[in-house]
Amino acid sequence: MPPTEQGATMNPRDGTDYLPISMLNQWAYCPRRFYYMYVLGEMEHNAPVLEGMLQHERVHAGGVESEGEARVHRRVYVWSDRLRIAGFADLVEVRGGVLLPVEYKHGRMGRWLNDHIQLCAQAMCLEERTGRPVPCGAVFYWGSRRRQVVELDAKLRARTEAAIVQARALAESGALPPPLTHRAKCRDCSLEPVCLPREVRRLREEAAGHGGAGGSCEPWRRST
């Protein structure tokens, strides 16, 4: 039985084990961010997040329309019973019987594996639902005003399936991952005020520098 639209946004602990496709993007970007958003339900809105939400609203308006030889379907709900994932594709273009999922992103074009994994997951859902091969997809980056065509090859598909397994395992583990050491990712993250990556890293370094004295009351006894 296919999941409901609501099921695509629910945590498995709330009664469904269909992982939201958008959360695969978060996991590939930063497992700690994924855990905060998906498991703990944390979400903060900074300027880039709000701009991205407004841009997606513009993309999703309109339903189905024709653009040249292509038929364009907006905000298409997709799912895979095999992979136990579900979510929305911003656009699905149909040209000559070939499907092209298109994802819209706020930032600038680059080799963003997290975006490619999300796109690949959408494509595999479309393949399962329609029985048609989806050889490639595209990501439109608002910051560059350009579309990046992504080949959905065997390597990317394997990475995507591995991401699904690892993201689900992390959600079920109940263990908050450590912060990244990638300063640029942390700087641009809306959850940085909640995650406190610098502070957490500093505390970990201080604890490690005391040779494993953690768990002992001796340092405080010596100070009295």
Q: What is each PLM-predicted segment?
A:
Residues 201-224:
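Short microdomains enriched in Cys/His and/or Lys/Arg
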Residues 1-101, 217-224:
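Metal-dependent nuclease catalytic cores that hydrolyze phosphodiester bonds in DNA/RNA
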Residues 21, 166-187:
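Immediate flanking context of iron-sulfur cluster ligation sites
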Residues 79-87, 92-175, 191-193:
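Nucleic-acid nuclease catalytic cores
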Residues 21, 32-33, 157, 164, ...:
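Alpha-helix initiation and N-capping motif
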Residues 184-197:
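Local cysteine-cluster metal-coordination motifs and their immediate loop/turn environment
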Residues 38-39, 195-199, 203-206:
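Extracellular/mature segments of secreted proteins
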